[in-house]
From Swiss-Prot:
This is Lysophosphatidylcholine acyltransferase 1. Pathway: Lipid metabolism; phospholipid metabolism. It is a single-pass type II membrane protein. Its EC number is 2.3.1.23, 2.3.1.51, 2.3.1.25, 2.3.1.67. Residues 1-52 are cytoplasmic. Residues 443-478 form the EF-hand domain. Exhibits both acyltransferase and acetyltransferase activities. Activity is calcium-independent. Catalyzes the conversion of lysophosphatidylcholine (1-acyl-sn-glycero-3-phosphocholine or LPC) into phosphatidylcholine (1,2-diacyl-sn-glycero-3-phosphocholine or PC). Catalyzes the conversion 1-acyl-sn-glycerol-3-phosphate (lysophosphatidic acid or LPA) into 1,2-diacyl-sn-glycerol-3-phosphate (phosphatidic acid or PA) by incorporating an acyl moiety at the sn-2 position of the glycerol backbone. The lineage of its organism: Eukaryota, Metazoa, Chordata, Craniata, Vertebrata. A motif (HXXXXD motif) lies at residues 129-134. The HXXXXD motif is essential for acyltransferase activity and may constitute the binding site for the phosphate moiety of the glycerol-3-phosphocholine. The di-lysine motif may confer endoplasmic reticulum localization. It comes from the Eukaryota. Keywords: Acyltransferase, Calcium, Cell membrane, Endoplasmic reticulum, Glycoprotein, Golgi apparatus, Lipid biosynthesis, Lipid droplet, Lipid metabolism, Membrane, Phospholipid biosynthesis, Phospholipid metabolism, Repeat, Signal-anchor, Transferase, Transmembrane, Transmembrane helix.
Amino acid sequence: MRFPNRKLHTAVNGGDSGVSTHFRNPFVHELRFTTLQKLKIAVMTVTLFPVRLLFAAFMMLLAWPFAFVATVGRSENAVEPLSWWRWLVDLALKAIMRAMWFSGGFHWVRVKGRPALPSEAPILTMAPHSSYFDAIPVTMTMASIVMKAESKDIPVWGTLIKFIRPVFVSRSDQDSRRKTVEEIKRRASSNGEWPQIMIFPEGTCTNRSCLIAFKPGAFIPGVPVQPVVLRYPNELDTISWTWQGPGAFKILWLTLCQLHNFVEIEYLPTYTPSEEEKKDPALFASNVRRIMAKALGLPIIDYSFEDCQLAMAKGPLRLPKHTCLLEFARLVRLLGLKTKVTDEVLQEEACSARQLCGRRLDMEGFAQYLHQPMTEAVQDIFSLFEEHGMMDVREYVIALSVVCRPFRYLDTVKLAFRMFEAQEDGAIVEDELTVILKTALGVGDLAVSELFRAIDSQDKGKITFDELCSFMEKCPDLVEQYHCLCESISQHSRESTSSSNGFCADFSPRNHSKKQD
């Protein structure tokens, strides 16, 4: 796959977000420290960090008996009138939680806008979701949230969670999704009797460089929602907790080492859905997302929680941060191709591609190969692979295998060998290995000469699938170890820009620079 230089259509779903379409990989977060910042962190680690950590733990322990007493004898399926002593417990818990956040450096929490009453907006939609620190507005409002059922069994934390009456999702119950939606609808239709439900519709954490696709759960009830946007206007972003980046404890450590941590919570006007939006939760979600993106000054892009699997996949062919396979996955999903892909379908695609014997297709030929009309999405997919107006459909099949089977890299490599290998000995040459790895990683440039020579220990000028697999077992990080990506990364870094909150690598295969109309 390659990075076309031409400017293409944005990934924004229908409308003006009022911002530049210069996207970054939302699932990747990197931190780069200056020497002075490293020195500051070192000093804070042995002075302020342990004090803050101990005090925060103490405040959580202090909150536990209040939450425990308040939940004793309380019905899980009905809401009783709030008694005076439970009201006092609610105030005490809010004060304790605020003290805990204060001890962590969140000295000022700026709140803009007017929070709606539960009767006005039973659901709060909050974005962008970037960290466990997004719990700050939850503890300030004591609104209900949607959480996995296993959370209530965690000592101390589980009791605090049960106090806010969350909607629990059970991973072991295959019918859990339907039950969760029904419970949200039941509470949202209670005319303000239940506490508001605070939902993060993105469904996963990102680096706040854009708003990804909203899940429809918050919008299926068809009731008014209040959009709430979060900002962390810090000089250094130690908040973001993404699929590729610092781990949970490192984020906690670095954040507690900052002298001040700023957070802004802005309540936007309540959004009442139209009759059309009530019938179409996806449209409802899209329109709310557009309003939130405009308030944040961020682009919107149709990546989803499912795309995180690409970022999570481990192994020798772990995707680099600047891969354009995320864009490919979005386009494939847009065409409805991903749901139709099975192992058998991929094998059939590979056979069809091999029968072309390396013959390259133009855009019309590619559309016919996909059995799709000539749409914008088909043109965008073609642009990811084309060189001089032609493409090798084998590259498309490899990319399709990666996005549909992100955790089965060996199956993808085996499929690629089937399409490229010589019939007499099942081997491929260096140029073919380059194409396979470039496509499987979703990059535009790759240096594999050193890697190929290492695999081809007998200097035959070709390698087999078994030889590559054997080498992968000995060298699980072969792409990084043999510096295959160094040239591509350096070239891409020169084209990338860093954000004010840390460094987030660009991933789009396009040079997004035009404004949306």
